[in-house]
């Protein structure tokens, strides 16, 4: 039986594509393994998925771009992670390794290359993260969502591979219940914060619940079950799975962070959106770059977190609603998307 090893983690964005690809390989008779951190979100997501995947936990250290005494300790953690990954590779002898990035992916990528296993990696953002900059040196090929510099000879630009489609999905019973609490005469706004970025949206909705629900139906994906609530013009929930795309479709506008996975999902369904990127103090600035790219293309409006107030947000919402046709026309004309089926076929071809 052919074997494939996946790696990637730290945030949901570094796991999502793996979760989409693994069932495809399982259906085609591959034995699927995953290398990550058992304390990380990658392990939680795989357990939640119920997929027949063998998880191997390794030591991992954070890769920092700044001086910290912890860097010394983390060098040893990464080194031990490489040794652990090398033993896993030599024991499994897989046909390939597919990496979605994140700090935990560096040891398996290095170990795969050392043991002669082909390495394929995927980069979602406009500029490479530090983990993928290191991984690129050991990669057989990198697939990119955005076009990269021509000097990167091993990069193939494939566009965004998303988990949503422009086809309407069946309405779950839960969605019908939510809609009975909404006013059909008001626009519906969905706040999506991702695994690490929901806090500022949660605070905004909490602080201005009365004003927001007088003018909009509000859906708030919080990541915090203590905030769960369903009442007139308001639905707050910590986490959704089957409801994810139906809620996207229900919304007139989405307010989101600038992670590539989410904004390309919105592009795929031509959904109006305001991007509030994580700032440089909380990230390497990749979300700011992604947001600027989408604004330049005419797909979205952006708003820096430091400028986020009820008034500034409403100004952006009003602008999008009054220019809805222009934004949607540009999104529908985009050539920057690839279906999961097409990407899977491309990946299988490259593996052969």
Swiss-Prot record:
It is a peripheral membrane protein. It is an enzyme of class 2 (transferase). It comes from the Bacteria. One of its GO terms (cellular component) is plasma membrane. Pathway: Cell wall biogenesis; peptidoglycan biosynthesis. It is found in: Cell membrane. It catalyses: Mur2Ac(oyl-L-Ala-gamma-D-Glu-L-Lys-D-Ala-D-Ala)-di-trans,octa-cis-undecaprenyl diphosphate + UDP-N-acetyl-alpha-D-glucosamine = beta-D-GlcNAc-(1->4)-Mur2Ac(oyl-L-Ala-gamma-D-Glu-L-Lys-D-Ala-D-Ala)-di-trans,octa-cis-undecaprenyl diphosphate + UDP + H(+). Disulfide bonds: none annotated. Cell wall formation. Catalyzes the transfer of a GlcNAc subunit on undecaprenyl-pyrophosphoryl-MurNAc-pentapeptide (lipid intermediate I) to form undecaprenyl-pyrophosphoryl-MurNAc-(pentapeptide)GlcNAc (lipid intermediate II). Belongs to the glycosyltransferase 28 family. MurG subfamily. This is UDP-N-acetylglucosamine--N-acetylmuramyl-(pentapeptide) pyrophosphoryl-undecaprenol N-acetylglucosamine transferase. The gene is murG.
């Amino acid at each position: 039986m052919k074997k494939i090893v996946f790696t990637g983690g730290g945030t949901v964005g570094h796991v999502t594509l793996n979760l989409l690809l693994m069932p495809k390989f399982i259906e085609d008779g591959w034995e699927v393994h995953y290398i990550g951190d058992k304390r990380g979100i990658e392990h939680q997501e795989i357990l939640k998925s119920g997929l027949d995947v063998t998880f191997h936990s390794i030591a991992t250290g954070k890769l920092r771009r700044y001086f910290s005494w912890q860097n010394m300790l983390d060098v040893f953690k990464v080194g031990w992670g490489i040794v652990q990954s090398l033993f896993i590779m030599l024991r499994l002898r897989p046909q390939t390794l597919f990496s979605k990035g994140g700090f935990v992916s560096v040891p398996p990528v290095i170990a795969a290359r050392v043991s002669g296993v082909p390495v394929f990696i995927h980069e979602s953002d406009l500029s490479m993260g530090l983990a993928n900059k290191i991984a690129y040196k050991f990669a057989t090929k990198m697939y990119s969502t955005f076009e990269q510099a021509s000097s990167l000879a091993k990069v193939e630009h494939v566009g965004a591979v998303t988990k949503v489609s422009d086809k309407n999905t069946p309405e779950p019973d839960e969605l019908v219940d939510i809609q009975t609490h909404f006013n059909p005469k008001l626009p519906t706004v969905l706040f999506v914060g991702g695994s690490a970025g929901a806090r500022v949206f949660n605070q905004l909705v909490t602080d201005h619940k009365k004003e927001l629900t007088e003018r909009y139906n509000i859906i708030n994906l919080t990541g915090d079950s203590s905030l769960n609530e369903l009442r007139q013009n308001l639905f707050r929930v910590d986490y959704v799975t089957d409801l994810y795309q139906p809620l996207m479709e229900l919304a007139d506008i989405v307010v989101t962070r600038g992670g590539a996975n989410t904004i390309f999902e919105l592009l795929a369904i031509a959904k109006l959106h305001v991007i509030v990127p994580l700032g440089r103090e909380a990230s390497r600035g990749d979300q700011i770059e992604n947001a600027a790219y989408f604004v330049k293309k005419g797909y979205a409006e952006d708003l820096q977190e430091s400028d986020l107030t009820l008034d500034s947000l409403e100004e952006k919402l009003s602008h999008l609603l009054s220019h809805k046709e222009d934004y949607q026309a540009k999104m529908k004309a985009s050539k920057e998307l690839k279906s999961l089926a097409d990407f899977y076929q491309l990946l299988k071809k490259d593996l052969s």
